[in-house]
Amino acid sequence: MKFDPESIKKAAKEDFDSAWTSGKDLIKKTGLNQQYPHTSFHFGKAHPVYDTIAKLREAYLRMGFDEMMNPLIVDEKEVYKQFGHEALAVLDRCYYLAGLPRPNVGISDQRIAKIKEMLGGIDDEGIETIRKVLHSYKKGEVEGDDLVPEIALKLNVSDALVVEMIDKVFPEFKELTPQATTKTLRSHMTSGWFISLSGILERSRPPFHLFSIDRSFRREQQEDASRLMTYYSASCVIMDEDVTVDHGKAVAQGLLAQFGFEKFMFRPDEKRSKYYVPDTQIEVFAYHPKLVGSNTKYSDGWIEIATFGIYSPTALAEYNIPCPVMNLGLGVERLAMILHDSTDLRGMTYPQLPQYAEWELKDNELARMIFVDKLPETPEGQEILEGIVMQCDMHGSEPSPCEFVAWEGILKGKKVKVSVIEPEEDTKLCGPAAYNEVLVHENDVLGLPNNKKWKKAFENHSARTGVRFIEAFAAQAAKEIEEAVEKGEKECETRVRIVKVPSEINIKLDPLAQRYITGKKQKIDIRGPVFTTVRAEIE
C-alpha cells in the first residue's frame, strides 16, 4: 500500500528499529485465495506446429533461401501437366472445391401474392425490384451474403422480413446442392512450385533458392496417430543449370542439422514419381539423439524425415521451364513431434480436442484450482481469522480444558469477543491434523503434515496452496461470526472434529479439478483429526 516517505524518514531518525519493524504493516496482506500460487503470471505458449514452422523459416533464411507463397488452389489441368499418367492417382487424393449454384428464380402470381402478404405495402414496382435483384444474383453481380441486405435496402424493409420471405416463398434456395468445380486444394507443394517457377522466369534469371511453408490437403481414408487430412509442408527448390542430387543432400543436412540431427543416410525412394528424373528421388533418414530409447518405432534414433529429387524435364517443359530444379520437402508435423516429444500427430496438432489428446495438468495448475470456500468479508472478520490462527499456533498443544481469547472489538456495530476453546478434559486445544497443509503431489490433492516423511511433496512450493486446515477453519469461523452478528444472535460456535472430506474443513475444488482427478483415477485425501472449536460472544 502507498506510504508517506517524509513520515517514514522522520520515524526512522527517531527509532530506526521500530520504523523498520513497522514496515510490514504497510505491506498489504494477501487473502487466502489470492496468495501464491493463485497469484501467478501467465505466459503464452506457441503451438508446436507453428513453433516448428517459425524455426524452419529462420533455418531456410539463414541458408540464403527466399520465401515464397505458392498457390493453394490448383486447377486439375495443372495436375495433369505436372504428373502426366500419374495424375489420376494424385487427383484421387485431392479435395475438389464445390459451390452452390445460383438458381434462376421465377416469381409467379401466387408468389407475388405471398410476398405482398408477408412484406406489406409492396406494390408492383417493389416486385420488379425483387426480380431485378434476384437476376443480378443469378449473374453474380450480387454476392450471396449481400442478397438479403440488398433487397431490404431497396424495399426499405427489415432484413428479418426478407429472410423469412426468401425462406417461405423461394424454397429453391433450401434445395440447392453443391456442384463440383475443376479446382482442387493443393495436395503436394510441387503443384504450386511449377506454377510459381514458371511465373518467376518471366521476370528473373536463375539461379533461384526458394522455400515455402504452407498447408497441403490430402484425402486420407481416415486420420490416425501418423496421418492427418491437412498438414504443413516445408518445401524448397533450387533452380540452377548445374543442380544435382548432391545439392539435395547438402540442403537436407544444412537444414536438419539446425534442429539437432547428427547423422544422415540417403536411400532411393521406391515410389519413383514421374515428376522426378529417374533415380533422383531420394529419401532422407536422419539420426536424432532425442529419439534414442523413445517409446516409438524410431527408438534407434533414425527416422525418415524428408524427400528430395530433381524435377523431370518432361514436367518442367509443360511450363516452359528450361533449367533443372531440385525440390526437397518435409512434413512439419513429423519434425514437430520430434522436437516436442509427441507420439500422436492428432494429439499434438489438436491438444484441445478430448478425442485426440490426453488431458494433462501439472501439480501447480491443480493447486490453483483449490480454494477456501467461506471467507470473511470485513476487515474485522479478517482480524478474527488471523487471531484464531495465532492462538492455535501459540497454544495448540495446551492441555484441556482451556480457552484463549483470539479477538475483541466492534463488528458491524456490535461488541464481539472471540475465543478458541476446548472444554473437554485430557485432550489439547487443537487436534494433530490442524496444521496439515493442502497441496498437490503427483496429481493427488492431499492434506499433509510438513515433516520429514513428506519432504518431497513440500519441496514444490508452486504446488502448495499455503493453506493449512487451521486457516481454512478459521476463515469459516470468522465468516459465521459475521453472519451471526447480522442476524442479531448473541452467540456463535463453530466446531470441527475429524475431517473426512474437503468441505468439512472449508476447502473446495474447482469442478474442472474434480473431473480431472476422477478421470485420471487420482485421489483427493484431505482428512484427519482437527478437533478445534471457536466461540463468539456478541453483545
Swiss-Prot record:
InterPro entries: aa-tRNA-synth_II (IPR006195), aa-tRNA-synth_II/BPL/LPL (IPR045864), O-Pseryl-tRNA(Cys)_ligase (IPR005246), Phenylalanyl-tRNA_Synthase (IPR002319), SepRS_C (IPR041590)
Subunit structure: Homotetramer. Interacts with SepCysS.
Residues that hold substrate according to the record: 188-190, 233-235, 275-276, 327
Annotated source species: Methanococcoides burtonii (strain DSM 6242 / NBRC 107633 / OCM 468 / ACE-M)
Lineage of source species: Archaea, Methanobacteriati, Methanobacteriota, Stenosarchaea group, Methanomicrobia
Domain of life, source organism: Archaea
GO molecular function terms noted in the UniProt entry: ATP binding; phosphoserine-tRNA(Cys) ligase activity; tRNA binding
Record's protein name: O-phosphoserine--tRNA(Cys) ligase
Protein family according to the UniProt entry: Belongs to the class-II aminoacyl-tRNA synthetase family. O-phosphoseryl-tRNA(Cys) synthetase subfamily.
HAMAP family for this protein: Sep_tRNA_synth (MF_01674)
Function: Catalyzes the attachment of O-phosphoserine (Sep) to tRNA(Cys).
